[in-house]
Amino acid sequence: MKIINIGVLAHVDAGKTTLTESLLYNSGAITELGSVDKGTTRTDNTLLERQRGITIQTGITSFQWENTKVNIIDTPGHMDFLAEVYRSLSVLDGAILLISAKDGVQAQTRILFHALRKMGIPTIFFINKIDQNGIDLSTVYQDIKEKLSAEIVIKQKVELYPNMCVTNFTESEQWDTVIEGNDDLLEKYMSGKSLEALELEQEESIRFHNCSLFPVYHGSAKNNIGIDNLIEVITNKFYSSTHRGQSELCGKVFKIEYSEKRQRLAYIRLYSGVLHLRDSVRISEKEKIKITEMYTSINGELCKIDKAYSGEIVILQNEFLKLNSVLGDTKLLPQRERIENPLPLLQTTVEPSKPQQREMLLDALLEISDSDPLLRYYVDSATHEIILSFLGKVQMEVTCALLQEKYHVEIEIKEPTVIYMERPLKKAEYTIHIEVPPNPFWASIGLSVSPLPLGSGMQYESSVSLGYLNQSFQNAVMEGIRYGCEQGLYGWNVTDCKICFKYGLYYSPVSTPADFRMLAPIVLEQVLKKAGTELLEPYLSFKIYAPQEYLSRAYTDAPKYCANIVDTQLKNNEVILSGEIPARCIQEYRSDLTFFTNGRSVCLTELKGYHVTTGEPVCQPRRPNSRIDKVRYMFNKIT
């Protein structure tokens, strides 16, 4: 049986969850349509998603049509959940990008399309909600051409009045874009020779799969218009990106989830081989795990299975698998462009409203952060406050609601602040010697640190001979330094510096790698005190797309948010502004843009780097480490 994995992507409220329900219903996977409004859909399966009416986590379901099984990934539709979208993109064979006939191409649509093209995922445009009043499809087509891609082919004829219907396009005009994109076909056409339907279809298929042509289909998911045709298109157009001829196993974890019974579930896309129950499988070419229980989606329901084939999505109950873990041979993973998940840029303090719920809160945060790598937390050693870091304010709001509604923990939360970094100011050296108080460890370590240009990252080298200090001790020093770099003098990550391990001494047989591992961060702190550090704040590069009439306002407002516009382009009555802005200002700038353009602007951002800040440094509390904090305290007293 052919297995394909498709993604359903769209801006908020474009109808992607409703479309998924219609695909399941029309294929016979379910006997009754679910409703977003009634909370009975198969993919928005958490209480929070049903209450808010938006998809927050990746939902997975499936249907079978003739000899093809289709796994549907119903991805989130809000900007703060793009990390979840990007993780799901890596396992797709193709995508359906929904566009509301009423709303046209929205900001989120453009962001999602940018990601799909970057990762090389064949994409179909599906214009949804064609049954709404006041629809002008020619305007929607023009919107797609100007904001997404001009390389589209309209595959259907739509009759809106008096009786709405969608039929396959038979006119020759549908092939114009296909012909114009191929020199041989264009020359043949211009010379008056006839073009066979087969060669046009083959050229369309080639360009569709290399992401240079995008078919356009139409319908109404809510009223079941155009859905049967879409099912035929899905099963015939998309290919499975699997190694059918390979017997070696290869799969990748793309989602971690906790069930209502607190079972830890790992979602895996298989790219090669067959996975059997009770198999022992190597993870990321390291340790092995035994497959004791395995599930997959069959006609919209999770079912236990004994084996799974290449192309399938399987769910394992496992405590050790992590996001992006690879089962089996890593060399068999598809070579796709990787879109890096953005770093958390904000943090805040969160505490339970009822002190007796503190342990419940910590347990809940452990589960949530395990599922979402953009959400991190730690407990301050001095104040015992719980510090939460995240990407955006909507992610923060959803996390708070999740804590209350799923874990039944009421919380109090402070206004979030930006996450900074530190860089040494000058070169410095420091050594802590063995058996010299207050050093309790059987180790001597000497380190030097020197600043590097912004954006260099942390570089480490050892000038201590392996012939003198063996690899296990050397590795322990490096691990201790990496741990120490997580907290500089002001409590932030240390970056853009070179750290050299210059001196080491051990006593045989009492010295152990643990002595070096625990002493290294203490030496690092002392050498940073000699060097001093400066604070760096995150800057984002941005690209703003807005109607041309808002150019003056966008320029006028930029200085208010410390934004620096470095390039301006005009295209199709649209202005494209490029520049950079402090991360602490982006939320307000983006909100302002949305407001004065009436939602017609797009602001794409990514981390550009860190700039030196001015003014009073912002401090962050240190995280606890009971094994070295007392020693740190003693050294700080004498230095």
Swiss-Prot record:
Highest rank taxon of the organism: Bacteria
CDD domains: Tet_C (cd03711), Tet_II (cd03690), Tet_III (cd16258), Tet_like_IV (cd01684), TetM_like (cd04168)
GO biological process, one term: translation
Protein biosynthesis is among the record's keywords: yes
Keywords: Antibiotic resistance, GTP-binding, Nucleotide-binding, Protein biosynthesis, Transposable element
GO MF: GTP binding; GTPase activity
Binding locations of GTP: 10-17, 74-78, 128-131
NCBIfam families, alphabetized: small_GTP, tet_protect, tet_protect_M, tet_protect_M_W
Family indicated by similarity: Belongs to the TRAFAC class translation factor GTPase superfamily. Classic translation factor GTPase family. TetM/TetO subfamily.
Function description: Abolishes the inhibitory effect of tetracyclin on protein synthesis by a non-covalent modification of the ribosomes.
Protein name: Tetracycline resistance protein TetM from transposon Tn5251
Organism this protein belongs to: Streptococcus pneumoniae
